[in-house]
Amino acid sequence: MSGKKSGLPDGRIPDRLPDGRPAVAWRSRWTEGTLPLWLVATAGGMAVLFVVGLFFYGSYTGVGSA
């Protein structure tokens, strides 16, 4: 490979600055944007567990309980 840096014609932002430091600080790497991804994933996981719990509850009570 050549030592020449690519100009990244597809619009990507390089992950390192010319002096070798990361382009985005580690503190803010996972919390950029409107809502942190970990918060969205936690809420989604809790919603899935709630719905699965409703199915189990419904299988022991009501119409399908035998």
Curated annotation (Swiss-Prot):
Top-rank lineage group of the source organism: Bacteria
Gene Ontology BP term (one): photosynthesis
Matching InterPro entries: PSII_PsbJ, PSII_PsbJ_sf
TM regions (residue ranges): 37-57
Organism this protein belongs to: Synechococcus sp. (strain WH7803)
Compartment(s) where it occurs, according to its Swiss-Prot or TrEMBL record: Cellular thylakoid membrane
Name assigned to this protein: Photosystem II reaction center protein J
Membrane-protein topology: Single-pass membrane protein
One Pfam family named in its UniProt record: PsbJ
The entry's keywords: Membrane, Photosynthesis, Photosystem II, Reaction center, Thylakoid, Transmembrane, Transmembrane helix
NCBIfam families to which the protein is assigned, alphabetical: PRK02565.1
One cellular-component annotation, GO: plasma membrane-derived thylakoid membrane
Entry's family note: Belongs to the PsbJ family.
Quaternary structure and interacting proteins, as annotated: PSII is composed of 1 copy each of membrane proteins PsbA, PsbB, PsbC, PsbD, PsbE, PsbF, PsbH, PsbI, PsbJ, PsbK, PsbL, PsbM, PsbT, PsbX, PsbY, PsbZ, Psb30/Ycf12, peripheral proteins PsbO, CyanoQ (PsbQ), PsbU, PsbV and a large number of cofactors. It forms dimeric complexes.
Main location (coarse class): membrane
Function according to Swiss-Prot or TrEMBL: One of the components of the core complex of photosystem II (PSII). PSII is a light-driven water:plastoquinone oxidoreductase that uses light energy to abstract electrons from H(2)O, generating O(2) and a proton gradient subsequently used for ATP formation. It consists of a core antenna complex that captures photons, and an electron transfer chain that converts photonic excitation into a charge separation.
Name of encoding gene: psbJ
